[in-house]
Amino acid sequence: MIKDKHMPALQGMFPSWITSCSSDGEPNTTVISQIWYVDENHVALSFQFFNKTKKNISENPYAYATISDPSTLKQYNLELKFDHEETEGELFDEMDMKLQAIASMTGMTGIFKLRAADVYKVCLLYTSDAADELLG
């Protein structure tokens, strides 16, 4: 599903968006710094502050994300399904280390606390038609 051509869009150069929906249909869109590559069928989001997103996902495990390739400006849409959360291990440690580095560089040490690495299955990944039209 996730190919080499998608990797630049998963490096965190441009913010990404995640949209979730509560069980009663109320949507919530949040801008996030990065969507992490886990393997060709999974991505992870850092769970820090997203209380509304986390609540929505507990009610409805499906989400929609958009990532952007910084070199081509192509946008890719990902249809996701929550799989599991990790609160320790290699993925969690890698995400926590990067989060702490970002906090340190922005003068926000101690503000960001990674609570979990939320892992999602990528159900569908496709190019945004609007980006294709803009890029010709």
Task: For each feature predicted by the language model, list its residue ranges.
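Short, basic/aromatic recognition patches
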Residues: M1-G12
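Short beta-strand segments
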Residues: L10-F47, A65, Y76
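Conserved small/polar residues in nucleotide/adenosyl-binding loops
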Residues: Y126-A131
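Leucine-biased recognition of intrinsically disordered, low-complexity hydrophobic segments
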Residues: L134-L135
